[in-house]
Amino acid sequence: MTEQYQHKARKRFGQNFLHDAGVIDRILRSINAKAGDRMLEIGPGQGALTAGILNSGAQLDVVELDKDLIPILNQQFAGKSNFNLHQGDALKFDFNSLNAAPNSLRVVGNLPYNISTPLIFHLLNNAGIIRDMHFMLQKEVVERLAAGPGGGDWGRLSIMVQYHCRVEHLFNVGPGAFNPPPKVDSAIVRLVPHAVLPHPAKDHRLLERVVREAFNQRRKTLRNTLKQLLSNAEIEAAGVDGSLRPEQLDLAAFVRLADKLAEQPAKAPEAD
């Protein structure tokens, strides 16, 4: 980045700017943007990934919260007809406003770690228009996203993201690739929405509710954590052993529990 484009990272925005050319190239090769792709970058920062995506010929919208970066990005990419900049909070951004065709939008970003989980859930609400997502996240978060049943990383984030997407932990990135260097390791993850849900729930809001309740006290058995929602007999009727802990259940089992809850007309989904 040239001196005229320098900008000091702001802690309140969770900014850690990517500067390692080798890492940037590896990310861009993983994304493999092509002419004609419809892409959205969240938190472009100083444009480390932006330039490479634009050079591919893809149509790129970017969403940046930091107002001080807007003129820098506009100046840096002035004259690029495939560049469109939005100043705002990605957590509040209406992705449908991009008018992307179903299963077409490719989302990328070096996400601020303090908003990564709520932002992923916000994106999952728009999974129907998304083709794939590539994110730089805290390594610990990526391990949770990609986790399987039986371990401590398996939880609400793993289950709800894997309900909607295939998860691929691509590679890790050390703190030295950033300025300033974060105190934790990072990783690149690829999320690909399922064309057909492998375990569709009757009501995904009930699935969210069951999973949330189950993991609120993850060391307790299901018959205890879910007692406000399902009786032990109902848990057993769903083909689940009520003496198990939530981390021992796979996605399909949680869907069966949610579907059992859906059979109770008095227990409507709670508002988010």
UniProtKB/Swiss-Prot annotation:
Q: What does the UniProt keyword field contain?
A: Cytoplasm, Methyltransferase, RNA-binding, rRNA processing, S-adenosyl-L-methionine, Transferase
- Spans traversing the lipid bilayer: none
Give Gene Ontology CC terms.
cytosol
Report the NCBIfam families cross-referenced here: ksgA (TIGR00755)
Its recorded reaction(s) are: adenosine(1518)/adenosine(1519) in 16S rRNA + 4 S-adenosyl-L-methionine = N(6)-dimethyladenosine(1518)/N(6)-dimethyladenosine(1519) in 16S rRNA + 4 S-adenosyl-L-homocysteine + 4 H(+)
The record, for SMART domains, names: rADc (SM00650)
Q: Specify whether Iron is a keyword of the entry.
A: no
The UniProt function text for this chain reads: Specifically dimethylates two adjacent adenosines (A1518 and A1519) in the loop of a conserved hairpin near the 3'-end of 16S rRNA in the 30S particle. May play a critical role in biogenesis of 30S subunits.
* Molecular function as annotated in GO: 16S rRNA (adenine(1518)-N(6)/adenine(1519)-N(6))-dimethyltransferase activity; RNA binding
Binding residue positions for S-adenosyl-L-methionine: 16, 18, 43, 64, 89, 110
Q: What is this protein's name?
A: Ribosomal RNA small subunit methyltransferase A
Where is the protein found, in the record's own terms? Cytoplasm
- Read off the HAMAP family from this record: 16SrRNA_methyltr_A
Stated family? Belongs to the class I-like SAM-binding methyltransferase superfamily. rRNA adenine N(6)-methyltransferase family. RsmA subfamily.
Name of the gene: rsmA
Q: What is its EC number?
A: 2.1.1.182
| Primary residence | cytoplasm
* UniProt KW Cytoplasm keyword: yes
Question: One short Pfam family name for this protein?
Answer: RrnaAD
